[in-house]
């Protein structure tokens, strides 16, 4: 009797070994996705790691392995993570999967420094019932997270900025009833109810307001220059990007429409941004600016004069704010032309000065 039990057990093991073979790897699908593509420094977000069994057989052993850039910090001490020699953080999960099922693991993480962070290919493995064989594969899907710059720590420029914006805002009283309609933009909560377009809002885009083209509505261009010969260009450029964030946030709060441009190459187009953002207001517009600033490198896109030359058009009521690392336009004729076309409403902020 015991012999029959032993034989049955051996046959069962062999059957399970065959059914759980590593050739089932082709039935597996793995992916990892951040739940936010744009985050603030030290903001906690999640990496969602999924493993799916597309086949008709049980997978008795499966493993997911993620290697995170050393800038990542895992926020949950219960997550199985450890540091490897390269400075990266290795995260590993083991599980089993019934047929046509999937499992998901959520890992809370954060990043302190501004920049673009690409996720390394996700490694997933399966093994047989006896643990004698194991096969692995990499998921090659591209995933990235953009970390925006911090708010400016030294906001000594705030008083100068406030005075400048006050001068720009005065122009809203030049004409009382402007009525030239040019389009729609996202409602920010500061526009009068009569400006809301209920027809456009009903299309499912959220509350939309009419854009009126008139000199009474203040407008600003925020320009960030990365063409500099300053000695400490890295820290100064980081300060420029932080100043730009703070300035754009103030413009959003005051309801002053603005466009944005940065004279720098972008590290990646992962977030779908460009180094210019058209005029607008609202959460989506501000997010586009932050995405641009998060991707900005220390490499200039053009010379400083070439960058400014793109804005040499009659500005009307538009003011210009130029943020630059140092005294980079001391002898620039282009800057003087821009000042003339702006009617004098040009504010130059240098990162190496406390203002």
What are these regions (language model features)?
Residues 12-270:
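An amphipathic, basic-hydrophobic helix/alpha-beta surface used to engage anionic
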Residues 179, 239-242, 281-291:
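Generic recognition of short, well-ordered alpha-helical interface segments
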């Amino acid at each position: 009797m015991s012999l029959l039990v032993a034989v049955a057990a051996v046959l069962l093991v062999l059957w399970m070994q065959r059914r759980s073979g590593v050739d089932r790897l082709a039935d597996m699908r793995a992916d990892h996705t951040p739940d936010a593509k744009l985050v603030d420094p030290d903001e906690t977000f999640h990496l969602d790691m999924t493993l799916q069994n597309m086949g008709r057989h049980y997978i008795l052993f499966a493993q997911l392995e993620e290697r995170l850039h050393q800038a990542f910090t895992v926020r949950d001490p219960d997550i199985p993570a450890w540091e490897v020699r390269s400075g990266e953080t290795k995260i590993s999960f083991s599980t089993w999967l019934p047929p046509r099922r999937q499992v998901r693991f959520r890992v809370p993480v954060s990043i302190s420094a501004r920049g673009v962070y690409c996720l390394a290919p996700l490694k997933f493995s399966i093994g047989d019932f006896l643990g004698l064989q194991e096969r692995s594969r990499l998921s090659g899907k591209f995933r990235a997270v953009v970390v925006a710059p911090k708010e400016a720590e030294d906001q000594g420029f705030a008083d100068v900025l406030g005075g400048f914006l006050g001068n720009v805002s005065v122009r809203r009283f030049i004409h009382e009833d402007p009525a030239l309609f040019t389009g729609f933009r996202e409602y920010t909560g500061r526009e009068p109810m009569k400006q809301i377009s209920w027809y456009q809002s009903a299309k499912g885009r959220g509350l939309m307001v009419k854009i009126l083209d008139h000199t009474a509505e203040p407008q600003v261009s925020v320009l960030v220059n990365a063409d500099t010969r300053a000695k400490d260009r890295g820290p100064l450029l980081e300060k420029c990007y932080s100043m730009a964030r703070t300035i754009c946030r103030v413009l959003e709060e005051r309801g002053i429409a603005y466009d944005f441009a940065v004279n720098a190459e972008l590290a990646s187009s992962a977030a779908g941004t460009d180094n210019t953002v058209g005029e607008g207001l609202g959460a989506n517009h501000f997010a586009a600016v932050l995405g641009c600033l998060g991707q900005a490198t220390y490499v200039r896109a053009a010379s400083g004069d070439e960058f400014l030359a793109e804005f040499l058009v009659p500005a009307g009521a538009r003011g210009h704010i130029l943020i630059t690392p140092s005294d980079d336009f001391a002898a620039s004729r282009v800057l003087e032309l821009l000042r003339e076309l702006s009617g004098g409403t040009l504010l130059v902020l240098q990162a190496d000065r406390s203002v």
